[in-house]
Amino acid sequence: MYGETANKLVQNAKRTQALPHLPPYASDLSRTIVREVRDLDRDVSAILAPYGSSFNPSADPSTACALLVNHLCMRRNKRCLLAYHKVRTEKLEGYCWEGIDILEQTGSGKEGEGGMAGKKEESSLSPEEEEYVRQYSDLLAAYKGQWTDIDLTGSLEPPRDLFIDVRVLKDAGEIQTEYGSITLTKNSQFYVRHGDVERLIAQGYLQRLS
C-alpha cells in the first residue's frame, strides 16, 4: 500500500529523536520509498500519455482523481524522506558542536576486532552522511578559528566544580593542560581542571567520577 513504507520511516525518525545515539541509517526503507515515487511517476506519465498536452480535468474527473492521488502520494513520500533526513542531520550537527567524533564512534573506516580482522565495522551512517559530517566539521573548525580565545562549542553552564576526578576509558595520549602535560592511559585516574578535560568527557575518552 502506497505510503506505508514512508510511515515506517517517520516512526523511525520519531524514535531517533528520543535516543541518545544515532541508529543505523534506514537504507532499505529509503530505497523502497524512492522506488515507489518512481513507480508513481511512471503511472502518471502512462495515464497522461494518451492525452498529450490537452488533458481537461473537468472532462474526465475519474482520471483527474487518479492523477491527484498519485501526486499526493509522491508529495507525502518526499516530505517523509525530508523529515527523516532532517532529524538525522540535526543530530549529526549536534554531535559536531558537542565535540563528539561520531565517525570514530560508529566505526567508520576502522577494522573490527575479535576475529574480524580485515573486515570493516559497519557504520551507522550512510556514505553521504559521513561526507556531510566531515564537511560540516571543517566548516565549524573554520568558524571557531576566528575566535581562538573562546570555545564556541563549550557548555553554556559554568562548571560546579573547578577540579574533578576522572577515569580514562580509552587511551588518548598526551594532552596539554594549564598545569602541564598528562598522559591519558586506559584505567588511569586523574584529578584535573574540569575545563581541560570537558571535551574529552563528551567524546567518551574520560568518565567523571562522583
From Swiss-Prot:
Entry annotated with the keyword Nucleus: yes
Swiss-Prot/TrEMBL GO biological process terms: DNA strand elongation involved in mitotic DNA replication
Ranges of biased composition (kind: Basic and acidic residues): 110-123
Region (Disordered): 108-129
Predominant location: nucleus
Cellular component aspect of the GO annotation: GINS complex
Annotated keywords: DNA replication, Nucleus
Keyword Glycosyltransferase: no
Localization, UniProt: Nucleus
Family assignment from sequence similarity: Belongs to the GINS1/PSF1 family.
Alphabetical list of PANTHER family matching this protein: DNA REPLICATION COMPLEX GINS PROTEIN PSF1 (PTHR12914:SF2), PARTNER OF SLD5 (PTHR12914)
Subunit structure: Component of the GINS complex which is a heterotetramer of SLD5, PSF1, PSF2 and PSF3.
Protein task: The GINS complex plays an essential role in the initiation of DNA replication.
The name this protein goes by in its record: DNA replication complex GINS protein PSF1
Organism annotation: Phaeosphaeria nodorum (strain SN15 / ATCC MYA-4574 / FGSC 10173) (Glume blotch fungus)
